Amino acid sequence: MILKNISIINFKNIKSANLELSPKINCLIGHNGMGKTNFLDAIYYLSFCRSAYNSIDSQIITHDEPFFMLEGNYDNDKGEIENVYCGMKRGTKKHFKRNKKEYKRLSQHIGLIPLILVSPSDVSLIEGGSEERRKLMDVVISQYDYSYIEALSNYNKALQQRNALLKMEEEPDITLLELWEQQMASNGELLYQKRQAFVDELVPLFQQIYQQISGDKEQVRLHYVSHCQRGPLLDVIQRDRFKDRAVGYSLHGVHRDDLEFLLGDYPMKREGSQGQNKTFVIALKLAQFTFLQRTSSNTLPLLLLDDIFDKLDAQRVEAIVKLVAGDHFGQIFITDTNRDHLDKILLNMQGDHTIFYVENGEIMK
């Protein structure tokens, strides 16, 4: 999938932009806070129907403006044009359209334009709680497996309903409680199976890329942990119902799953340096790119690289440059404050490129 051009109106600090894009590499240069990340977020929004950074849509509308609008035209693998549009006025719901036809459910759009974003906020994958790492799995799997989206939605609904019953002052209806527990178990076991299959395939890709970037200096591992590994999920959920009732929420289920990040045999969070942590998440995201390429009908995802070279030594920067400069990747968007990094990439790359300069929300060639 190739993003040919994009129109942006009132998206964060970008008041207006109409850009023709390179099918290979697009570089955005500018100081911090100028709008480079906001531009990448606009592209992300057209893939996922939401911002990568703001959960409340009204917060992405430019201050004192009544609406925002995004529109992108893509070349798909069949040589056809895909038009994707999103617009929202303050105080109303957003409208998301594909080829002028509005979606009934936004989840129907997920996976049409596969995309991987690598950004400084990815450090939360290591330093944050398990919900960050579950989200990582959810975002990737949802892009190629619609049944996963449905199971995740059904599981979260059942979890919410069970928790509401657990919070009641009077004894909850046991029939209702068991109904939601069964829904959690059936959908949860499906989520577990798909997450485990994803991790099994991701691990060797991730380890190979990490070794390429680090120069074989460290050994890294991923370890998926789930309550489903303790036995049938329904039994696990019901076993501690008394404790759940005491605390007022569900202590067991796939909403507590985790993906452990290890440097050698020790947690990355405790052992990794800033450079090792950044190498870890970059390798993880690039491995997800390769995984998605194999699973999304062999479609090359868009690759968004936001300020990825900060806190990396020269050897690791050079290794990443060589990686992303290869034919393995399709259309790439890279932001940096340092023109030298981008010049090195362009020297190593064959094919078309475009350089944009970003200042106070204005994007210029």
Model-inferred region functions:
Residues 1-31, 175-186, 190-302, 311, ...:
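Conserved NTPase motor "head" modules and their coupling/switch loops across ABC/AAA+ ATPases, GTPases
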Residues 36:
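Conserved lysine of the Walker
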Residues 44-56, 287-295:
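Post-Walker A helix-loop "phosphate-sensing" segment adjacent to the P-loop in P-loop NTPases
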Residues 48-126, 130-132, 138-144, 148, ...:
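Nucleotide-state sensing region of NTPase/ATPase domains
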Residues 72, 331-338:
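Structural recognition of the conserved hydrophobic beta-strand(s) that form the central parallel beta-sheet
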Residues 124-214, 225:
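An accessory alpha-helical subdomain
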Residues 306-308:
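Walker B catalytic acidic pair
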